[in-house]
Regions:
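Inward-facing hydrophobic residues that define packing positions of alpha-helical scaffold repeats
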Residues: 8, 27-28, 34, 44, ...
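Alpha-helical tetratricopeptide repeat
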Residues: 1-11
C-alpha cells in the first residue's frame, strides 16, 4: 500500500469512528504526498468536509 492510500484508509477509519479531526489530518497528509498542489486538491476538499463535520458536532469551537 502506498503512502497516499495509507493515509486515505486511516482517514476513512477515523471518519467511521466519528473522529473527524483525525480524518481531516490524514486527508491533509495524503494531499501533501502528491507531487503538485493540483493533484492533492481532492484530498484537501475531503479534509475541509471532515473539519466541517467536526464543527457541526461541536468538536471544534469556532470563534466569532
Amino acid at each position: 500500500m502506498d503512502t497516499i492510500a495509507y493515509h486515505q484508509k486511516l482517514a476513512g477509519l477515523a471518519h467511521e469512528r466519528g473522529d473527524y479531526v483525525s480524518a481531516a489530518r490524514h486527508y491533509r497528509d495524503a494531499a501533501n504526498c502528491y507531487p503538485s498542489a493540483e493533484q492533492g486538491e481532492p484530498c484537501l476538499k475531503l479534509a475541509e468536509q471532515e473539519l466541517a463535520h467536526a464543527v457541526a458536532k461541536g468538536m471544534i469551537l469556532v470563534g466569532h
